[in-house]
Curated annotation (Swiss-Prot):
One of its GO terms (molecular function) is acyl-[acyl-carrier-protein]-UDP-N-acetylglucosamine O-acyltransferase activity. SUPFAM superfamilies: Trimeric LpxA-like enzymes. Keywords: Acyltransferase, Cytoplasm, Lipid A biosynthesis, Lipid biosynthesis, Lipid metabolism, Repeat, Transferase. Its EC number is 2.3.1.129. Homotrimer. Belongs to the transferase hexapeptide repeat family. LpxA subfamily. This is Acyl-[acyl-carrier-protein]--UDP-N-acetylglucosamine O-acyltransferase. The lineage of its organism: Bacteria, Pseudomonadati, Pseudomonadota, Betaproteobacteria, Neisseriales. Pathway: Glycolipid biosynthesis; lipid IV(A) biosynthesis; lipid IV(A) from (3R)-3-hydroxytetradecanoyl-[acyl-carrier-protein] and UDP-N-acetyl-alpha-D-glucosamine: step 1/6.
Length: 258
């Protein structure tokens, strides 16, 4: 059986595993590498120094590895790296990285990216995330594991969203969202704990209670932020589910939502 449609345009320098399926009118550039059992629908365009792993499913009209929307970009050989087992739906756009950033845009494994989502240059997305339709990341955004972005979520450049966090429909994320927390609103504010997401991913009632106490410490007890952070970091030394806060606070540059 022919796995590549005869109307697809694939540069002879591109490296595709023999099991890759390519739909009609798809265009694949010379510096693209695609791993085993990845399926690409019709009318997709994959350019740039783009590496795509195994068992991905890329739907029609996706645009992957196009140059970043950055006026400083001067055709440097920056990268887009996509892991394994991702679903990338219609009209998604993933841009290359920039030399003024980390030089690459990275997406991990088992992510579910719905239609019309956008990942700008130098974004880093972890594993097992869900991006609902039209969620968009500006440049240099970091998304942790098991994050859920509601439809039309917009994330400002350089923001971080921690593991297991969740945003509501049309959230405008202008500061960092701590792990496990929910954010909502045009200028996103804390909206409670993603306790249902934690339960679905195997957290115990005791672990959820410990994280809930962190939320209360940050937002409901009137404690100055630096004192609250120090208290959380002390608890993180003995409570494994709180360890993610240590790295999150250390890497946060924009401050957290309040």
């Amino acid at each position: 059986m022919t796995l590549i449609h005869p109307t697809a345009v694939i540069d002879p320098k591109a490296e595709l595993d023999s099991s890759v399926k390519v739909g009609a009118y798809t265009v694949i550039g010379p510096n693209v590498q695609i791993g085993a059992n990845t399926e690409i629908g019709p009318h997709a365009v994959i350019n740039g120094h783009t590496s795509i792993g195994e068992n991905n499913r890329i739907f029609q009209f996706a645009s992957l590895g196009e140059i970043p929307q950055d006026k400083k970009y001067r055709d440097e050989p920056t990268k887009l790296i996509i892991g394994n087992g991702n679903t990338i739906r219609e009209f998604t756009t993933f841009n290359l990285g920039t030399v003024t950033g980390i030089g690459e845009t990275r997406i991990g494994d088992d992510n579910w990216i719905m239609a019309y989502c956008h990942l700008a240059h130098d974004c880093v997305v972890g594993n097992h995330t869900i991006f609902a339709n039209n969620a968009s990341l500006a440049g240099h955004v970091t998304i942790g594991d098991y994050v859920v972005l509601g439809g039309y979520t917009l994330v400002f450049q350089f923001c971080r969203i921690g593991d297991y966090a969740m945003t509501a429909f049309a959230a405008g994320v202008h500061k960092d969202v701590p792990p496990y927390f929910m954010a909502s609103g045009y200028r996103a504010e804390p909206a409670g704990l993603n306790s249902e997401g934690m339960r679905r991913n195997g957290f115990t009632a005791e672990q959820i209670s410990a994280v809930k106490d962190v939320y209360k410490t940050l937002y409901h007890r009137g404690i100055p932020f630096e004192e609250a952070k120090a208290d959380i970091l002390r608890r993180a030394e003995t409570q494994a589910e709180l360890a993610v806060f240590r790295d999150f606070f250390a890497q946060s540059a924009r401050g957290i939502i309040r």
